[in-house]
Design a protein with these regions (language model features):
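Bacterial Sec-dependent N-terminal signal peptides
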Residues: 1-24
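Terminal domain-start segments
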Residues: 20-96
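Short, hydrophobic/aromatic-rich segments at coil-to-beta transitions
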Residues: 74-77, 101-105
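Structural signature of eukaryotic scaffold interfaces centered on beta-propeller domains
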Residues: 89-99, 156-165
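Short beta-strand elements that form the blades of beta-propeller/WD-repeat-like
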Residues: 102-112, 165
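Structural motif
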Residues: 114-124
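Short loop/turn segments immediately following beta-strands, especially the blade-tip
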Residues: 127-136
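Short aromatic loop motif centered on NTY/YTY
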Residues: 135-165
Length: 165
């Protein structure tokens, strides 16, 4: 009887710790429209539904153009907003909380200026979409992932151009 009780308690504790893990789709779903005027809430939900159904995640955006979510994992996503703008997001768990913040969302926008270079803008948010304007204690792996976003975007554009041709 005691073993059964301990087993049940262990299973309950394990399931509650899993339930607390945050994934990027939950944060993306709650994103304010003002931060990404290209996409409505329904557009964002459609992206995830299409990818979950193994379909191409392309939608008509708010400016009558086409936008496509090209990747979605538990901690990252990529969206080609149009031919000149790509958005990447990373959801990174901090090794040690910053005040009450355990996760930070990295929002990287890369504006293509020519075939080789792009202008990159990176902002940091809490999972509740409050912008963070202070130093964040990244570990080395997190820092490398953030720094790779700009180059990754440019390489993806070149690959898309080659694949279209």
């Amino acid at each position: 009887m005691r073993r059964l009780l301990y087993s049940c308690l262990f299973a309950l504790m394990a399931s509650s710790s899993v339930a607390q893990e945050l994934v990027i789709r939950d944060v993306f779903r709650q994103m304010p429209d003002s931060l990404m005027p290209y996409l409505s809430t329904n557009n964002r939900l459609d992206f995830m539904d299409f990818l979950d159904s193994k379909m191409k995640a392309e939608i008509k955006n708010q400016f009558d153009g086409k936008s496509e979510m090209t990747a979605l994992t538990d901690d990252s996503l990529s969206i080609r907003m149009n031919d000149a703008l790509r958005v990447d997001m990373l959801l990174l768990k901090l090794d040690e909380p910053l005040d009450t913040i355990s996760y930070v969302l990295v929002l990287a926008e890369t504006f293509k200026t020519d075939s080789v270079y792009g202008d990159k803008s990176i902002k940091f948010f809490t999972p509740q979409w409050q912008q963070i304007r202070r130093d964040i204690p990244w570990n080395d792996i997190q820092r490398k992932r953030i720094n790779s976003l700009g180059l990754q975007n440019i390489l993806k554009w070149d690959e898309e151009i080659i694949n279209r041709g």
